[in-house]
Amino acid sequence: MNDLFSSSFKKYTDLKQQAQMDDIESGKETMNLDKFFEDVENVKDNMKGVETLYKSLQDSNEECKTVHNAKKVKELRAKMDGDVAQVLKRVKMIKQKLEALEKANANSRNVSGCGPGSSTDRTRTSVVSGLGKKLKDLMDSFQGLRARMNAEYKETVERRYFTITGEQADEQTIENLISSGESENFLQKAIQEQGRGQILDTISEIQERHDAVKEIEKNLIELHQVFLDMAALVESQGQQLNDIESHVSKASSFVRRGTDQLQDAREYQKSSRKWTCYAILLFIVVFALLLIPALPHIMLMLK
């Protein structure tokens, strides 16, 4: 994640410059991609914001593992809930902007000189496809965070249970604690032996952790669904780019074959001219050889 945006977007400026150079070299008016790249920059800024929030969630999750106080867990829960809500908001904005970019690309193909396979179209399609791939990386990162949080929550509940009861909880007990959050029901023996006040903080802490994990998981599932909605767009752009590259490759192949055939024709033409010259020269030589013996007789007749 640290290097996710450090160098990925440098190519967009290069692609823009290349598209403009291609248009100039082909004798066409340079296509205006400024608005397109301005929209791309907006998407990039939102994606960087999502990355920052992801790091904040990571840090809060790490801090939560070392906390043993229900009040502090509650504070961290509120912070993480806020971060996830911001992530959802930004990702939904990114989705809308990606869809708008894809629509703009489709409209651009109707402009003269910007049709499928043109340098402008290849640039637009490549950039949108690249943005989609970065979103895929983000999606995988959040899925990984969600899995880690669930696994770490389970480990924390196991440790707290052992600390209070001195017993190793079986898998079913841990699953029941995690699914219900009703830790008091599973700690009756400890409450009877130590008193409710002795373990109240731990019970509250487990409850806060349960509520935090469930709420964050619900939001992360919603976030994942938004990512999945964008996956179709990413796949479509990737396939479109592959189709364009395939057409360009085929066109280049046809051009190369045409050039080779033209070169062969020129060589054949040169060869034909050469042999024609040889034939004419041979005819002249033969004619001269036939004419020389008869030349005295012809001269006598002329006299």
Curated annotation (Swiss-Prot):
The residue ranges for the Cytoplasmic side of the membrane come to 1-279
Q: Which PROSITE patterns match?
A: SYNTAXIN, T_SNARE
GO BP terms in the entry: intracellular protein transport; pollen tube growth; vesicle-mediated transport
- Cystine links in this protein are none
Entry-linked InterPro entries? SNARE, Syntaxin, Syntaxin/epimorphin_CS, Syntaxin_N, T_SNARE_dom
Primary residence: membrane
The residue ranges crossing the membrane are 280-300
Q: Looking at the keywords, is Aminoacyl-tRNA synthetase present? A: no
Pfam (any one): SNARE
Identify the Gene3D superfamilies for this entry: 1.20.5.110, 1.20.58.70
Q: Per the database record, which ranges form the t-SNARE coiled-coil homology domain?
A: 203-265
Top-level taxon of the source organism:
Eukaryota
Sites of N-acetylmethionine modification: M1
* Claim: Acyltransferase is one of the keywords in the record: no
Positions of region (Disordered): 107-126
Q: Which residues form a coiled coil?
A: 31-112
One GO molecular function term of this record is:
SNAP receptor activity
The annotated topology with respect to the bilayer is: Single-pass type IV membrane protein
Listed A to Z, the keywords are: Acetylation, Coiled coil, Membrane, Protein transport, Transmembrane, Transmembrane helix, Transport
Localization per Swiss-Prot or TrEMBL:
Membrane
Q: Give the protein family.
A: Belongs to the syntaxin family.
General function of this protein = Vesicle trafficking protein that functions in the secretory pathway.
- Quaternary arrangement and interactors, per the entry? Part of the t-SNARE complex.
Q: What is this protein called?
A: Syntaxin-124
Biological source species: Arabidopsis thaliana
The organism that produces this protein has a lineage beginning with: Eukaryota, Viridiplantae, Streptophyta, Embryophyta, Tracheophyta
